[in-house]
């Protein structure tokens, strides 16, 4: 549990905000120096997501997606805009969202909203999104705030909509990264939080072909 590794919740959030403010608004910056894995990540995410967009009568719609912890829009540009009519982005770092407007280019016109907000304080509009994509950002929320955020996301899904979490998984327990002020949870902890948010796990998949030295990365589809 995050309560065991986070001594001061307020400082946990403020330190992360300060950390991201000094990160360059580039793909390499978004990926902590691992910009070269971006295509591997996006291609796997596309396959994972398309199984829900292609299903029969219960298939997920393609009207609007929400990119959480969007940064400069790496995922919006390469995964979401090609598949959805419109996308909203939310990130705590204003400079990233400003840079996104340049980075996204012409297709960026289909980004409806750029929300500058931490996810612990963000409430997505009810009944608005077919897909809510939450990647490499859940570690910046406490367990309680993550469960509460997922509940709010559940309420903002359109019929047959899904939430996707894609993130690092620890081998065991919860590990604090003091540099960027985030935590890495193991699979059981993440599944428990998902369950406590009243969500069902539709699919779970481990990302392949990543460098050996980084955490295992898993995707979860939820509803």
UniProtKB/Swiss-Prot annotation:
Positions annotated to bind S-adenosyl-L-methionine: 69, 74, 91-93, 119-120, 135
N-acetylmethionine (modified residue): where? 1
Q: Which InterPro entries match?
A: MeTrfase_NTM1, SAM-dependent_MTases_sf
Q: Which UniProt keywords apply?
A: Acetylation, Methyltransferase, Nucleus, S-adenosyl-L-methionine, Transferase
Describe the effect of residue 20 to A/M/Y.
Nearly abolishes methyltransferase activity with CENPA
**Location relative to the cell:** Nucleus
Q: Does the keyword Transferase apply?
A: yes
Q: Where on the chain is N-acetylthreonine found, per UniProt? A: 2
- EC number annotated for this UniProt entry: 2.1.1.244
Give the reaction(s) catalysed.
N-terminal L-alanyl-L-prolyl-L-lysyl-[protein] + 3 S-adenosyl-L-methionine = N-terminal N,N,N-trimethyl-L-alanyl-L-prolyl-L-lysyl-[protein] + 3 S-adenosyl-L-homocysteine + 3 H(+); N-terminal L-seryl-L-prolyl-L-lysyl-[protein] + 3 S-adenosyl-L-methionine = N-terminal N,N,N-trimethyl-L-seryl-L-prolyl-L-lysyl-[protein] + 3 S-adenosyl-L-homocysteine + 3 H(+); N-terminal L-prolyl-L-prolyl-L-lysyl-[protein] + 2 S-adenosyl-L-methionine = N-terminal N,N-dimethyl-L-prolyl-L-prolyl-L-lysyl-[protein] + 2 S-adenosyl-L-homocysteine + 2 H(+)
Impact upon substituting residue 180 to K? Induces a strong decrease in methyltransferase activity
Q: Does the keyword Methyltransferase apply?
A: yes
Look up the record and give one Gene Ontology term from the biological process aspect: N-terminal peptidyl-proline dimethylation
Impact noted for substituting residue 167 to N/Q: Abolishes methyltransferase activity with CENPA
GO terms (molecular function) for this protein are:
histone methyltransferase activity; N-terminal protein N-methyltransferase activity; protein methyltransferase activity
**What GO CC annotations are associated with the protein?**
cytoplasm; cytosol; nucleoplasm; nucleus
Q: What does this protein do?
A: Distributive alpha-N-methyltransferase that methylates the N-terminus of target proteins containing the N-terminal motif [Ala/Gly/Pro/Ser]-Pro-Lys when the initiator Met is cleaved. Specifically catalyzes mono-, di- or tri-methylation of the exposed alpha-amino group of the Ala, Gly or Ser residue in the [Ala/Gly/Ser]-Pro-Lys motif and mono- or di-methylation of Pro in the Pro-Pro-Lys motif. Some of the substrates may be primed by NTMT2-mediated monomethylation. Catalyzes the trimethylation of the N-terminal Gly in CENPA (after removal of Met-1).
Would you identify the family this protein belongs to, as annotated? Belongs to the methyltransferase superfamily. NTM1 family.
**Protein name, per record:** N-terminal Xaa-Pro-Lys N-methyltransferase 1
